[in-house]
Amino acid sequence: MTKFIFVTGGVVSSLGKGITAASLAAVLEARGLKVTMTKMDPYINVDPGTMSPFQHGEVFVTEDGAETDLDLGYYERFLRHSKMSKTNNFTSGRIYQTVLNKERRGDYLGGTVQVIPHITDEIKHRIHASGEGHDIAIIEIGGTVGDIESLPFMEAVRQMQVELGRNRAMLMHLTLVPYISSAGETKTKPTQHSVKELRSIGLQPDVLICRSEHAIGEENRRKIALFTNVEERAVITCEDADTIYQIPRTLYEQDLDDIICERFGIDAPEADLSDWDKVVDGLLNAQGKVTVAIVGKYVELPDAYKSINEALLHAGITHKTQVEIDYVDAEALETDDSLLARLEQADSILVPGGFGERGKLGKMRAIKFARENKMPYLGICLGMQLAVIEYATNVLGLEADSTEFNRKAAEPIIGLITEWLDEKGELQVRTDDSDLGGTMRLGSQKAELVEGSKLHQIYGAKLITERHRHRYEMNNRYIEPLEQAGMSISGYSAKQHLVESVEIADHPWFIGVQFHPEFTSSPREGHPLFASFVKAAIDHQNI
């Protein structure tokens, strides 16, 4: 039966609960255990699909088309044998929506609907469902202990600990141990108060992960153990690392996996972390460096492009090359000529996905720069669409645009997808008046690559599967004039012949893809498209 590890955070947010939980999952998986992970988010939004990237960071898309928290990207990158799905991320909004729908249907037989038991029961039901078929399920609770929004989740965890017992449930609490530089001291009091807050709602941590900029020391570990009622060996120190991919070994060297296996009565072989050692070695001992200019409109918050950042990092590991990212504000690039110098200094240019017209002309300016200067270019989703618009405008001389920006465009080369088959093969229909949330072409879709194309060579296969998140697509009636002018279509959707990718034949490396390859990149395997893109940047640097 599935064992559950609940992960909470205290003192401050952004301590790295997701990374720590994923690192633990990687160590347990390395011991031969079947591990899955779930993120519970206390906010009222049904999902993060319509949330601003400035507030929430990127939206990570799963194989089955769920728009989820970016932490699920960490989960997939750290786990080799477990893919996330719709069951692995849910919010307060989703829980309340489900409970209210049941109330409207009469499922509660006229009873008074309350937080306890109805909301907490729905939370517990989803936790159990997410862990089915696995040895261990790690459940991360978003936010910080003490947040009013997270109380129903904490109560559900408390109930599950009672119902499952010590041999099937345990609590891991992440906390900050700050270093006061003026006093030259590490302070344990915030951790003590954080655990006190947990205990006030009936939760006692079994493991403490103490985050700090500096070494905490054995004396402070003993002090924390004494005042929090946690076994001293279960007080795990986690100092700032050079790379997040060092964290699995950090946890392993402090026997966290042994503590968990002993608690759950699991007999499993020792973990082999040699793969992670190779990843860390590739990152920290790079033999060269390239710069990739990412031209977007959310550049003030790198988390908005988290999976792309990581995919470039993974490609760097493949080539033992440090990939430095220069974030260029697309909106500023529209009028600021001085930013062109940053494009000139880069070794390649990437325009990521996005929505809305803001920054459009700056992105197209960067695309034109890459095209005319034979600089490696990768366009993802909107980055592909704008590459098509730029080419049609400046090479074909058309008044081309997307109906996303101009519904009365003279040459609507990009338009709304009105019908497509989803990942289950079911017909989906959309109009301009459809809701924004949950109405896109989402999840894994098959694409057929044109034989002999650069993309076909990169993937080494004719049929590929990649994840999508878009509601606009290239208009097929422009395929012929584009191809006659030198921009070829290198991939189509397997069933409906939607354009999936474009490339320019007389350019060293110019590719646009409608899908999101960054969602399937991992530190141990990388991704062929990003690996080829970084190799093209290395080649361009050496010209």
Curated annotation (Swiss-Prot):
UTP binds at S13, K187, T188, K189, P190, T191, Q192, K223. The keyword Magnesium applies. Residues 291-543 form the Glutamine amidotransferase type-1 domain. Keywords: ATP-binding, Glutamine amidotransferase, Ligase, Magnesium, Metal-binding, Nucleotide-binding, Pyrimidine biosynthesis. Mg(2+) binds at D71, E140. It is an enzyme of class 6 (ligase). ATP binds at S14, L15, G16, K17, G18, I19, D71. It catalyses: UTP + L-glutamine + ATP + H2O = CTP + L-glutamate + ADP + phosphate + 2 H(+); L-glutamine + H2O = L-glutamate + NH4(+); UTP + NH4(+) + ATP = CTP + ADP + phosphate + 2 H(+). Residues 1-266 are annotated as: Amidoligase domain. Its EC number is 6.3.4.2. The active site is at C381 (nucleophile), H516, E518. L-glutamine binds at G354, L382, G383, M384, Q385, E404, R471. Catalyzes the ATP-dependent amination of UTP to CTP with either L-glutamine or ammonia as the source of nitrogen. Regulates intracellular CTP levels through interactions with the four ribonucleotide triphosphates. HAMAP family: PyrG. Homotetramer. Belongs to the CTP synthase family. This is CTP synthase. It comes from Psychrobacter sp. (strain PRwf-1).
